[in-house]
Every structure is written in structure tokens, then in C-alpha cells.
């Protein structure tokens, strides 16, 4: 064996280290351990007992993360390091990519063999997506709404997930009510002025009453990362009809989608391009979702009789790739509906 083998082995195992570490960080959050440690140093036996965890196994798990410098262990006392504490704001990305899609990555070979789409944990995908949106999509939609002729009286979120995105839009407004539509929508409203309907967007719009007087100019519909799912699951025609139906009901439709540019070297040389969008693009190849380009969506909106009032991208301080795009749509004058 040549003397360089071990060095090459260490390099070859770095993706395995990353795989285990991503799982470890996700479960640090998911187990409730992170919240306890965020309050300050804890005694492992007492913390484990209060969370219903096995103390011996928990100690081994915490030791693993201490070796990666996310925790500091001294006897039975454990605390977050500065590196560990800094993880807090990024929890939603782990909930989405690890919690929501861990099972998806395990099915890659099956999908390549043509055995259908890979599965995912829809509940955790929704939780992670809503949490991430507080940093990118939520401010983006607020900017789109600022371009409305007047502040809306109500918002209909056609793919609301766990409802936190919608709650963030209406929180503190006092005059705005929200309706959340999603198969995984909460059974009960977490706040006054919100109500939820457990339904798919196309079914809801098909069954909803269209105002006899025309679109309600005081209402806006929202489709954040929704059209990509309808496109793959129900086809282009269903997306066109969804846009038309939303604009028959409401004065405006806000859409947020991801520009599909996986073969663009400029994107893939970007740090966030490799860290987030490269796996994100892969996941959409494997699951029942379909990303498309900015040009594709513009053409589809035209076909649906919609006019793009304004187009914006996510805050570059959060995402400077320009890939997360928001559109504010209204009915094009004279277009068939």
C-alpha cells in the first residue's frame, strides 16, 4: 500500500462525514435537545429524562457532535459552542433538506431504474419551507404586495403548508385576514383572522364560488412554490387553469418559483448554488415536482391571460443568486378567462 492511501481515504470520506453531520444536526433540532441547550448548559441525565430520551444513547450522540465542535462536554455537563449556537437560524434548511428529503435520497437508484417518483415527508417539507421563507420568500411576497394599488383585505394562500408563512403575512396588520389551503394545513387556526381548509389548490379553486361581480380587488391569492408541483402532478393545462381560476376570484395572484438553471456555470460556481440549489435541483428530478425557467413561467402566464405587474427576486443579502423569483399577476385586459 502506498503512503498516500490514508490521505486519499480521508478526502474520500468527507462526503460521508457531511452526510452523518447533516443527520446529526437535524436530530439535534428535532429531538428538542437544541432548545434546551439554547437556554444554557445542561446536565445530560436530567435533560435526557425530561425529554424522554435514553441517557446513555443521548450522551453518545452529544459526544459525536462535541467531536465536531458544535457542543462542549465536561463530565455530565453539555453546552452549545459558539459554532453550535450559530446554527439556530438555519434550522429550517435542515428540516427541509434532511427531515423532508432524507428518504428521497435513499431512493435514487430506484428512481433511476424507472420505479416511479421518490417519496418525501410532506409535513416536514412544509415546515422547513415555511421556516426558510421567513428569510426569503416572505419578504419577497411583502414586496410584491407593496406594488398593489391598495393593501389587500384578505390573502388566500393556495399552498400554505403549516400556516406559518400565511400567519407572517397577516401578523400585525389588524385589517388583513388569511385563508390557507393545503392538504397538510393545520386543523386549528393558530391566530385570529386565519382559517384553514385541508384541500389541494386546484380542487379548492374548482369548488370555490367565483364572485358574480368579477374578481375581488381587495383579495390576493398566493402560490409560493406551488406551481412546480401542479405542473408535474397535473400538467401544464392544470397550471394554466389554476392561474385563470385564481384571477377570476381575486384581483391579483402572487407567484414565487425557482428559476431552473442547473447547467448554468455562473449559478453552480456560486457558493449557495452548490450548497443549496444543486441538491435542490436534484430533489426535483427525483420527486413529483418540476422546476422551470423564468422564460417558461412568463410564457405560461401569457397563455393564462395574465399580465406580470412586477417581477422581483429574493433579498440578495440572503440569496444573491437571483434564482428565487416573485411575480405579481393580474388579468390581462381582453384576455379570455
Swiss-Prot record:
Keyword line: Antibiotic biosynthesis, Methyltransferase, S-adenosyl-L-methionine, Transferase
InterPro entries on file: MrsA (IPR030899), SAM-dependent_MTases_sf (IPR029063), WH-like_DNA-bd_sf (IPR036388), WH_DNA-bd_sf (IPR036390)
Family: Belongs to the 2-ketoarginine methyltransferase family.
Molecular functions (GO terms): methyltransferase activity
Protein name (Swiss-Prot/TrEMBL): 2-ketoarginine methyltransferase
Gene of this entry: argN
Keyword S-adenosyl-L-methionine recorded: yes
GO terms classed as biological process: antibiotic biosynthetic process; methylation
Gene3D superfamilies given in the database record: Vaccinia Virus protein VP39 (3.40.50.150), Winged helix-like DNA-binding domain superfamily/Winged helix DNA-binding domain (1.10.10.10)
EC number of this enzyme: 2.1.1.243
Pathway where this protein functions: Antibiotic biosynthesis
The reaction(s) this protein catalyses: 5-guanidino-2-oxopentanoate + S-adenosyl-L-methionine = (3R)-5-guanidino-3-methyl-2-oxopentanoate + S-adenosyl-L-homocysteine + H(+)
Origin organism lineage: Bacteria, Bacillati, Actinomycetota, Actinomycetes, Kitasatosporales
Transferase recorded as keyword: yes
Job description of the protein: S-adenosyl-L-methionine-dependent methyltransferase involved in the formation of the rare amino acid 3-methylarginine (MeArg), which is incorporated into the peptidyl nucleoside antibiotic arginomycin. Transfers the methyl group from S-adenosyl-L-methionine into 5-guanidino-2-oxopentanoate acid to yield 5-guanidino-3-methyl-2-oxopentanoate, a precursor of MeArg.
